[in-house]
Amino acid sequence: MKSLNVLLIFSILSLVGCSSPSPNIQPRAKFGLLFPDSIGIATMESAYRTAPRYVPGASQIGMFPQIALRRLEFFDEQTCSVTEPMRAYGSMQARDLNALTDFCLRQQVASKVEPTKGQAMQQSIDVFFATDRKELRDGAILGFGNERGSFSVGLVQVSIPREHKLGAVERWSSSTLWPRRSEDGFEILSIRLQGQQSFFQQTKEQLQNSKERRAFIFVHGYNVSFADAALRTAQLALDLDPEALPVFFSWPSQGAMQAYPVDSQNAEWTEANLQKFLETFGSTSGAESIVVIAHSMGSRPAMRALAKVLDKRRDLRSKFKELVLAAPDIDADVFVRDLVPAYVALRMPVTLYASAKDKALQLSKQFNGSPRAGDANPRPPVIAGIETVDATDIDTDFLGHAYVAETRALLTDVTLLIKNRLRATDRPGLLKVDAGAGLSFWRFKK
């Protein structure tokens, strides 16, 4: 069977070369003189990659570019705007709000990795997980396989690459001549199983430092291993909302392109476990603002499980703020007839991202004999009570199925949705489209 899901591996961006101005000029002045005529995102990219050169001692400790840019005080993270010093030196004149917000996302990563005085540079992130996959052991826990297993929770420590491109899950390449280093890419450093009491005690402790106590729960799709899900969640944590608690639920996908029928059965089987986890997380984790992000086939159990939780536990409705459906591989008729009405009745916000270029969902349509909710051909599903975003015009991989996690415009839009709580009508990158009968959907501006 042809692949229904391909996750491309992106290479790490190379550093931009430039000559250093006179050493008697102050760091910010030095930095500004390098880019006197540039405008927009190209300047921001150059500034991002070269900033460590102009912070004393940065190269000796391997300072992250995000941190160096903060030290130079060229960017205001709170307002996502350029500071006056940077404007004064002509380094950047960003006029595009989406590009500016995108760059702001990079800077917020620094809050995760900048050490306090006397600490070593943090180069990893802890990602919380729940899974019903079978454990892989050799005495100690090695990971989780593709078979059904008992329910487990714990933490995965994932390395953070020094140079991270928005939307990419960079991985170390075996073809390189350089020795392997964890900071070269996303990599699982350790897996720690925990009891539920210890697990939720740790979520509470981490959320205590968060003003809004935000968390997101990622439910992956078809053809995804446990390791793939962990690395993708770490990438989403960096790119979407570094201040939110990153959590993923991993069901027993076979991690194989030809195993679509088995994955489909397991996605149905996992629903009860996911429902139990969502309910327990909502009531026990300490999070006050929870977003569920479901991709592809993972949207099936996620939609049903969350609706049951919210119907059963009225006290949790205020905590679950949004359900984001990214390219959902759900029968479109079932979606409209059975699933959406439940969320409309619950007054639960739902955002659907769909694309007419999603070849994976087109293949799924052929396999299942029915159109899919994430397929925007000839147009996306437009239903009263949910917000639909047509991402057809966004450049994606050749299957166009992982676009929400991998493309700049999509990541920016999702961030404005889940972190800034902006509805589609208020997000600057979207254009409202009249669908008739008093209904509307949104497209990305060209």
Q: What do the predicted segments below correspond to?
A:
Residues 18-35:
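Bacterial Sec signal peptide processing site at the extreme N-terminus
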Residues 1-7:
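Bacterial N-terminal signal peptides that target proteins for export
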Residues 102-210, 230-240, 244-289, 306-322, ...:
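Lipolytic serine-hydrolase domain surface
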Residues 217-221, 327:
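The conserved beta1-alpha1 loop
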Residues 32-103:
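Post-signal/leader-peptide non-cytosolic segments of secretory proteins
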Residues 294, 298, 302:
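Gly/Ala-rich beta-loop-alpha elbow adjacent to hydrolase catalytic centers
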